[in-house]
């Protein structure tokens, strides 16, 4: 199988310049080159590194894992290929929080999600069902928890 790199060098250079400009405005360390962006895109295997969806012939974005506003560096090691949906949903969230959201929403543990879990010491767990369709025992009139369930709050890294 012969693979042909169809990434436009001019567009990559423009994208790198835009990322570098944004990083400069945030006083973030690091400077990216078009070659580093190309390498990150090719390393992703054509999938969103957050949710795992295919990005072949689809729109994609490069996302800082730890956002520049949170002190993240403008380096290739802090970049992932992301679908527009994941990039928008992540926004300025801490990567550990977003990785947990991805895992809860999709059930997937991409290599990036697992790397973030490992980095921040997160043990993924499945939450027990709270709705009657998933837990018919909660529907029973003699259930002592009936009407007493409250939302759970979590502490996330700042």
What are these regions (language model features)?
Residues 33-36, 68, 83, 87:
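Residue-level detector of alpha-helix boundaries and kinks
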Residues 35-41, 55, 72-73, 155-158:
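Short, mixed-charge, low-aromatic patches
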